[in-house]
Amino acid sequence: MKARRLALWMGAALALHAATAAGDPVSHSAYERETIDAALEQTGGAIDPSPDGKQIESIEIITLEVIEERDPVPGFFNVFHATTLKSVIRGELLFDEGEKYDARLVQESARNLRKRRQLSLVLLVPLRGSSPDKVRMLVITKDVWSLRLNTNVQIYEGKLLTLLLQPAEENMFGTHKMLGGLFILEPDTYSFGGQYMDRRVAGSRLQAVVSANLIVNRETGSPEGSFGTLFYGQPQYAVETKWSWKAMVVWYDEIFRSYVGTDLRRYDSPATPGDDRIPYVYDAARWFSAYSVTRSFGRELKHDVSTGVEIDRRRFRLRDAQSFAPAAVRDFTRQELPVTDTRVSPFLQLRSYTSHYHRVHDFETLGLEEDFRLGHEAVVRVYPASSEVASTRDMLGTHAALGYTLPFGSGIARAVAASTIEKSTRAATDATLQLGTRVVTPRVGFGRFVYDGLLISHYENYLNDQLTVGGDGRLRGYAPKQFIGKDVLASNLEFRTRPVQVWSVQVGGAVFYDTADAFDGFSDVRMKHGTGIGLRSVFPQAERIVFRADYGVPVTDKGFTFPGSLFIAFGQAFGMPTLPAPSLETDYRE
């Protein structure tokens, strides 16, 4: 179930101080330094330590093959891959020959390229020019395998929870257009479909995504739902882009099933004498569409004004309700089943943020450059709804969020806070408070500490939204999604080692201590604890995302609870906190 939602949001995502100031020194990983040294030898160039203000006399692009000489795989396999065209790389650069070198435009160009799924390594290096007042720009990129089987897998205690396979040509003819299929295997269903993505429609800045998928019951072989995404628009592709817009639709129509590990989650009503064992199985449908336009002001200090309209339709119904005691069904519906609701809302949004970034290594990936925005980010949105215009409720929605990020040596510190209130009648008001924090220390010996804290409180829960925590994320050692509630509190500490390069593969380790709980009201909090070790690896030939294997054991008053559990998946157990979106989709992400 989560994989379908993940694939859906991936479709929408596909659809959808100054440590980086001029003159600041740039550090590189051993893998990146090795790449730069080879490129300098190839071009016969030397790095220019002070390129600012000099005229760019040439732009030289080196596109590395997926399989290089330093890799243990024969280079013959490169014939099955379409290397990115140099014209595609050049089209993403925000500077040109004859212009003055501007560090901010160079860095923004690098960030734009790193967003591309088809590229794992991106390096922009200024070289000494033919005279002291000129500079050559060296652009180095490395493709990931284009004809590929994208995979996401979740394994718990040796049992397959989710398998996602996405056979795709992600770089058709070297143009970064993607055509692919999708297959998701879950305990009770499998899903299949297709998707197409064009980041530069007809050579323009317009982007388009189309994705549609069918859900089939594994036991009966009958279709039981669908999900997909449609997106068309022009994103804010550069700091100085003034206008952006989008039109998008996201939908799913499914039989929702909630699991604890590999077993169906079940509900027991306190109002009945026996164990009701009502399974968390219900019809769930959601259709969301958004149409908006944004005007952006400023360069270093940005202010975006957005307006548009959103339509959000939610439908939920318990299956086989007649098979259970009426009192238990009423309790389940009131306490656990999401509420059917329709909202049609025009909105006005103001967003303020800086265009300063901190360039780092070994945060969310290994051995590759990463960029995190520094300074403040603030969002305020107002969105009314009326029952006279197809909405279920008369309400006034407000969303306010604030985040701040500081460099911490080679680390970073970030805090975010957000409040969403949909004010209606007392019984129909929905309100959420979310707090998050992340501290990544500078390197300590052979690694760095990462602390992450999270609080989500649905203190008014008209929509009956439910959250889970477990071994698939912030509470390793327990069953995936083992605990459920409207509120979540989590505190996670990891020590992540510096990666070791094995050929070109980046390999690192982790030691962690987790404490978390999902609960209904703070009087119900019972924090659970877990600890363990993990393995992280990144294959630059395939992906920037880490592959992780975490072995954890619960920690109780009596000590460690063995045998514990092993969980295998892609991506870190918890991501860098960001401002929560006020709706299903508010920005286009590659």
Regions found by a protein language model. Give the residues of each.
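Feature captures outer-membrane beta-barrel proteins of Gram-negative bacteria and organelles
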Residues: 163-172, 190-208, 228-236, 289-295, ...
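Outer-membrane beta-barrel pore domains and translocons
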Residues: 62, 154-156, 168-170, 182-186, ...
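Periplasmic polypeptide-binding modules associated with outer-membrane biogenesis and secretion
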Residues: 23-160, 165-169, 176, 180-198, ...
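Outer-envelope beta-barrel architecture signal
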Residues: 53-55, 135, 145-149, 161, ...
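Outer-membrane beta-barrel translocator domains and adjoining extracellular loop/strand segments
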Residues: 191-197, 220-227, 246, 256-266, ...
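Transmembrane beta-barrel wall of Gram-negative outer-membrane proteins
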Residues: 194-318, 333
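C-terminal transmembrane beta-barrel domains of outer membrane proteins
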Residues: 93, 377-590
